[in-house]
Every structure is written in structure tokens, then in C-alpha cells.
Design a protein with these regions (language model features):
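Short inter-helical turns and helix N-cap capping residues of alpha-solenoid HEAT/ARM repeat scaffolds
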Residues: 301-302, 332-335
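Conserved small/polar residues in nucleotide/adenosyl-binding loops
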Residues: 337-339
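Alpha-solenoid HEAT/Armadillo-like helical repeat scaffolds in large eukaryotic proteins
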Residues: 296-297, 324-332
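Beta-propeller domains with acidic blade repeats across secreted/periplasmic ectodomains
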Residues: 1-296, 304-315
Length: 339
């Protein structure tokens, strides 16, 4: 959008994939990280990442980004520059990972879906360059194949969790159809600060996953935020944080879920979630073309404002911005977690 009319003025292809176009195991979303890079993923239908002219991309580690166990396979997570260059493969061996979310400290979180019906939906802390166990690391065999030290329970067996080198899951949530995910960095819900919030269209629920440190990673518990109850057409597909810190949940509203199916093409809903004692919807307007406005945007609850602030500050350059940013950091204000 070059002229501010909220309409794209041109279109540029960043990547192609081998397969999985218009597929629920394909590419779904990009996320802007605090390092100025783009984060994204694809499920196991995509099978590889290609340049716009169809060449397999070689990542920064010198490997082909391709499902061929050298070393990558199945679904993958990536990081790249805004123009699509300098691609890094951050994790692999997922099945149907939907979206990667990056918090202000650079940690990456996502969900993954099991072979439907095996109660193995999982949330992952993406430890960079990790193998996440959907298929055997060396043979590519599935979880049903016999192997030594096989897990007792199918949800654990599904991800080869006893195999050496497989990164443990943050939490497994049972059956479901996981969709959008964020890390909450607003002030309206202090009990959710820095916690993962995630939609699951299968059991008709949006949940938070408060976590605790364990070893080099984390574990978590489930905390429902907005459930469908008796309304089985409630299919939360994404969650976002508003500039005031409230939550917005998108519901595609359909009787079914999965398998590319949809029966209601006309209706959808958006819910806003606020504390019981909160009224209204207001937030400060910012002019990101000024230094103060860009810094204030960088401290916003919502990622979109932070992106605009980050972009403006980088355009201004270090000579104009460094003094003000260093003063803010020295103030030690909780709202500065986004810098």
C-alpha cells in the first residue's frame, strides 16, 4: 500500500512450494518478528520451498529446503528477511503446523495436528533447529511402525517422543483442529502476560496455555478463554490482540471442520473479549512518522502497531533514534518489553 488507501498497489511472489497449494497442510500465515524478519511455516503437504522461478531454495545452513530427510522432512518453520532472502529452517518434522507466533524476545510458538482421531494435538516451543518427531528421523517411517522403546500411549507414540533428539512438546491437548496462535503482550489481562493463546476449531474453544520452565524448555496447562458450549458451529480460526489489550477472536462459523470442507459460505463472526469490569473500546492514535509516535507504537499491545513503529524507527536511522530509545530502556518500564 504505497498511498495509504488500505489497498495493495502491487503483488510480489516471495516463494513457491512443491505441493499443498490451497491445502490445509500448506502455508497459512507470516508473522513479523522483533528482529525485523518474517517467520512462517508450512505443513507436510508443501514438501519444499522454492524461489518464484521454481528453484529449490538453499537455506543459510547450506541445505536444500525439501522433504527428503537431508536433514529436513514433513512440516517446517522458517525465518527470512522481508524480501524473502536469507531463509533459515528453524524446525522440522511437523505434520499440520498452522501458524508460527513470535514473542518480543524472539521465542517461537506454534501448534500441530495429529493424524486425525488420535488425540495428539500439540503446542510447541520451537527450539531452533529442532526435530519434532512426526516421522522417524532416519527412515521416515510413521508412528504405527514397530520400533524399539516405543511409547505406551498413542498420543506420545504419534510424535516419536522416546526417540533420541526429538524436542518435547509444550503440551498435548487431545483431539482437535488447531488454528491461529499468538503470544499475549498487552496489559488488559495481566494474568495472561507473555502466555500463548490459541484457537482450536475442533473442540470449539480458544485457550491460553500458562507455562512453567522445565529444563531447557517448558511445560504448560490449559486455560479456556472462550468456549462454544452448546454452539457447535463456533469454529475459532484466529485470535489477535487489539491496541487496547483486548482480544479479538475470529469464528468462521460452520457445522464441520477439516478436510478442506466448508458448508456455510456466507456467515462468520468476530468476538471481542474484555474483563468483566471493563467498558468501552478506546486507544491513543499515533503518528508513526514522528519519533515519539513511532516509539509509542513500538510499545503497543498489538503487533500491527509495533510493526509500523519498528519500520518507521528503522527508516529514521540510528542517529535520530538511539538517544530516545536508550532513555526508554533505562526507565525499566514493563511496557518496554516490545523493544
Amino acid at each position: 500500500d504505497n498511498n495509504g488507501d488500505d489497498k495493495p498497489d502491487d503483488k510480489k511472489v516471495l516463494f513457491n512450494v512443491i505441493g499443498g497449494k490451497q491445502h490445509d497442510h500448506g502455508i497459512h500465515a507470516f508473522c513479523f518478528g522483533p528482529d525485523g524478519k518474517l517467520y512462517f511455516n508450512f505443513g507436510n503437504a508443501s514438501r519444499g520451498l522454492k524461489t518464484p522461478d521454481g528453484k529449490i531454495i538453499i537455506d543459510k545452513a547450506g541445505n536444500e529446503i525439501k522433504d527428503h530427510r537431508k536433514p529436513y522432512q514433513q512440516g517446517m518453520v522458517f525465518r527470512c528477511d522481508p524480501d524473502g532472502s536469507n531463509v533459515e529452517t528453524l524446525g522440522w518434522n511437523f505434520r499440520n503446523n498452522w501458524e508460527a507466533s513470535v514473542d518480543s524476545f524472539g521465542s517461537i510458538w506454534q501448534s500441530d495436528n495429529d493424524d486425525d482421531g488420535n488425540r495428539g494435538v500439540r503446542i510447541n516451543f520451537v527450539m531452533e533447529f529442532g526435530n519434532y518427531g512426526y516421522r522417524d528421523e532416519f527412515t521416515g517411517k510413521g508412528w504405527r511402525d514397530k520400533r524399539s522403546n516405543i511409547e505406551k500411549e498413542i498420543p506420545d507414540r504419534h510424535w516419536h517422543l522416546n526417540d533420541p533428539g526429538v524436542v518435547p512438546n509444550l503440551i498435548q491437548t487431545g483431539a482437535g483442529s488447531p488454528t491461529g496462535i499468538i503470544v499475549y503482550e498487552g496489559k488488559m489481562f495481566p494474568q495472561l502476560l507473555n502466555q500463548v493463546i490459541h484457537c482450536d476449531a475442533g473442540p470449539n474453544v480458544c485457550r491460553a496455555y500458562p507455562r512453567k520452565n522445565i529444563g531447557a524448555g517448558y511445560n504448560a496447562e490449559m486455560m479456556p478463554i472462550l468456549s462454544g458450549g452448546k454452539d457447535k458451529w463456533y469454529r475459532p480460526s484466529d485470535v489477535a490482540v487489539g491496541p487496547d489489550g483486548s482480544l479479538f477472536i475470529a469464528d468462521w462459523y460452520d457445522p464441520g471442520v477439516g478436510g478442506h470442507g466448508m458448508r456455510d459460505l456466507e456467515r462468520g463472526r468476530i468476538f471481542r473479549v474484555i474483563p468483566k469490569d471493563h467498558n468501552g473500546y478506546s486507544f491513543a492514535k499515533r503518528n508513526v512518522n514522528t519519533l515519539d509516535g513511532a516509539i509509542n507504537a513500538l510499545m503497543s499491545s498489538d503487533l500491527e502497531s509495533r510493526y509500523l513503529g519498528w519500520k518507521s524507527l528503522h527508516k529514521m536511522g540510528i542517529d535520530k533514534t538511539e538517544k530516545s530509545l536508550m532513555k526508554l530502556i533505562s526507565d525499566n518500564d514493563l511496557s518496554l518489553i516490545h523493544i
